[in-house]
C-alpha cells in the first residue's frame, strides 16, 4: 500500500513518554500506535521496533531515541521514547526532542520510583509545560485501594515539584493488555489520548513570537551597506522595521532595509527562513557572529545564569578528568563561543559536591565575560578547545 500523503490540517504537538525504567514506557508507546492504527490514525509499531531505536548525535552527544507519529481526531503528534535512563537525561537537557508535554508512565505495581522523581524534576527544569499520568500495569493490581494510594502519592509528588498535582489527569491503563487487543484496555488508551488532547496545551507557534535571529555571518556590500545572515529562530521581520542588535557589546538600534533569501528580495522573513538582512547605518565591524537581531525591546542581554548540565563521559568525547568550581570553559550559545566561568555547582538533587566528574549531572551557576542574549529554557554547550564537554539548559537568569 502506498504511503498516504501526510495532511497538515491539524495542529502539531510534540510529546514523549517519561518515567522509571521498566514501568512500561515503550510498551505504552506501542499500545498507543496499535489502538490508533485501528482507526487509521497511526501505523502500528511493536515493542521491538520502538526499543531498537537508532543512535542519534545531537551536539556531539550520542542519544538513543525512538520517534513515532500518530494522530487523534484533533491533533497530529510526534512522540519520542528513549530506551535508557541516561538517554532521557541527555535528550531533555540538549533539547534534541523538545516536548510540549509528556506522558508520565508510573507502574501501579511499584508506584513512584527514583527515576520517576528525576524525570518530573527534569521536566520542570527544562520547561516541559504539561504532564498527563498513565498509571500502567493496572491489570496486575486487584486491589482498587492500592491503585488509589499510588495515584494520591503521584499527585502529591507532582505538587511538590510545582506541577498542578490535583488537576493533572491520571488514567489507569495496561499497555500490554491493550496490545493484546482486550477491548476494555483499548478503551483506556483512547481515554489517555483524550486526556492528552485536553490537558497538553497547543504550543505557541514560533512565528507568533517576537522576532529573533542569531547572527551567523556578516558581509559588507559596497554601496548598499552591511548584511547579517542567519536563520530566523522565531517571529518575522519586515522591510522598514526597527530591530535591536543585542549581545557582546552595547545594544544598538537599526532599521532593516532589505530581506534577502536565495538571492531574491523579500518583503519579510519568517521563522525557519535562512536570510540576509540589510541593516541601515551599521558598519561591518559593529556586528559579529554571536549577536542576535531582535524585535525592539523584546530581550535583554545577561551574563549570569543557572543551568542544568550533563557533563560528557570520556567515551563520549568529554573530559578525562574532573573539574572544580572556578573552571573557565567556553559556553557555546546559539552561534558562538563565549568564555565564562562555572562559579558554583551542586549535584542535580541539590547536594554539595566538591568536583564534577565526566558523566555527572549538575546544577551550576555560570558567569560570562560578555553579556549575551540568554533566555530561560535555552540550550547551550560547554566546550573546551573546540570540543563539546557538556550540554546544558538555562534554568534561571540571575543578572
Curated annotation (Swiss-Prot):
User: Which positions fall inside the tr-type G domain?
Assistant: 10-204
Binding locations of GTP? 19-26, 81-85, 136-139
- Cellular localisation: Cytoplasm
Could you confirm whether the keyword Chaperone appears in this record?
A: no
Q: Where is this region: G3?
A: 81-84
The UniProt entry lists the main location of this chain as cytoplasm
How is the quaternary structure described? Monomer.
Q: Is ATP-binding among this UniProt entry's keywords? A: no
Quote the protein name from its UniProt record: Elongation factor Tu
Q: Where is this region: G5?
A: 174-176
Superkingdom of source: Bacteria
- Could you tell me which residues belong to the region G2? 60-64
Report the leader peptide range: none
Provide the residue span(s) of the region labelled G4: 136-139
- What is the species of this protein? Prochlorococcus marinus (strain NATL1A)
Q: Which reaction does it catalyse?
A: GTP + H2O = GDP + phosphate + H(+)
Q: Name one GO cellular component term.
A: cytosol
Keywords for this entry? Cytoplasm, Elongation factor, GTP-binding, Hydrolase, Magnesium, Metal-binding, Nucleotide-binding, Protein biosynthesis
Which function does this protein serve? Answer: GTP hydrolase that promotes the GTP-dependent binding of aminoacyl-tRNA to the A-site of ribosomes during protein biosynthesis.
Q: What is its EC number?
A: 3.6.5.3
Q: So what family is this one in? A: Belongs to the TRAFAC class translation factor GTPase superfamily. Classic translation factor GTPase family. EF-Tu/EF-1A subfamily.
Q: Which PANTHER family match?
A: ELONGATION FACTOR TU, MITOCHONDRIAL, ELONGATION FACTOR TU-RELATED
* Stretches the record annotates as G1: 19-26
- Gene name of the record: tuf
Where Mg(2+) binds, per the record, is at 26
Amino acid at each position: 500500500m502506498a504511503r498516504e500523503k501526510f495532511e497538515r490540517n491539524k495542529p502539531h504537538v510534540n510529546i514523549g513518554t517519561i518515567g522509571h525504567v521498566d514501568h512500561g514506557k515503550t510498551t505504552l508507546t506501542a499500545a498507543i500506535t496499535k489502538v490508533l492504527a485501528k482507526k487509521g490514525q497511526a501505523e502500528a509499531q511493536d515493542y521491538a521496533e520502538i526499543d531498537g531505536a537508532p543512535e542519534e548525535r545531537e551536539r556531539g552527544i550520542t542519544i538513543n531515541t525512538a520517534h513515532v507519529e500518530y494522530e487523534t481526531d484533533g491533533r497530529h503528534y510526534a512522540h519520542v521514547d528513549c530506551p535508557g535512563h541516561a538517554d532521557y537525561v541527555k535528550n531533555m537537557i540538549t533539547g534534541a526532542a523538545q516536548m510540549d508535554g509528556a506522558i508520565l508512565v508510573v507502574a501501579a505495581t511499584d508506584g513512584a520510583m527514583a527515576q520517576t522523581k528525576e524525570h518530573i524534576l527534569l521536566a520542570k527544569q527544562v520547561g516541559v509545560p504539561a504532564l498527563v499520568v498513565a498509571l500502567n500495569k493496572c491489570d496486575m493490581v486487584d486491589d482498587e485501594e492500592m491503585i488509589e494510594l499510588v495515584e494520591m502519592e503521584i499527585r502529591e509528588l507532582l505538587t511538590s515539584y510545582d506541577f498542578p498535582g490535583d488537576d493533572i489527569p491520571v488514567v489507569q491503563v495496561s499497555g500490554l493488555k491493550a496490545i493484546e487487543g482486550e477491548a476494555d484496555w483499548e478503551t483506556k488508551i483512547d481515554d489517555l489520548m483524550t486526556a492528552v488532547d485536553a490537558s497538553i496545551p497547543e504550543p505557541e507557534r514560533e512565528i507568533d513570537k517576537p522576532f529573533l535571529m542569531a547572527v551567523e555571518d556578516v558581509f559588507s556590500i559596497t554601496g548598499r551597506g552591511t548584511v547579517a545572515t542567519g536563520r530566523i529562530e522565531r517571529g518575522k521581520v519586515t522591510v522598514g522595521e526597527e530591530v535591536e542588535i543585542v549581545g557582546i557589546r552595547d545594544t544598538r538600534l537599526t532599521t532593516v532595509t532589505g530581506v534577502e533569501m536565495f538571492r531574491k528580495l523579500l518583503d519579510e522573513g519568517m521563522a525557519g527562513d535562512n536570510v540576509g538582512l540589510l541593516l541601515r547605518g551599521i558598519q561591518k565591524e559593529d556586528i559579529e557572529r554571536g549577536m542576535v537581531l531582535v524585535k525592539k525591546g523584546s530581550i535583554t542581554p545577561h551574563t549570569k545564569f543557572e543551568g542544568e548540565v550533563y557533563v560528557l563521559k570520556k567515551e563520549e568525547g568529554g573530559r578525562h578528568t574532573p573539574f572544580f568550581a572556578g573552571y573557565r570553559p567556553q559556553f557555546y550559545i546559539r552561534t558562538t563561543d563565549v568564555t565564562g566561568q562555572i562559579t558554583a555547582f551542586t549535584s542535580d538533587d541539590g547536594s554539595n559536591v566538591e568536583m564534577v566528574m565526566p558523566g555527572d549531572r549538575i546544577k551550576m551557576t555560570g558567569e560570562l565575560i560578555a553579556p549575551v542574549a540568554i533566555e530561560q529554557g535555552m540550550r547551550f554547550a560547554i566546550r573546551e578547545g573546540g570540543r563539546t564537554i557538556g550540554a546544558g539548559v538555562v534554568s534561571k537568569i540571575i543578572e
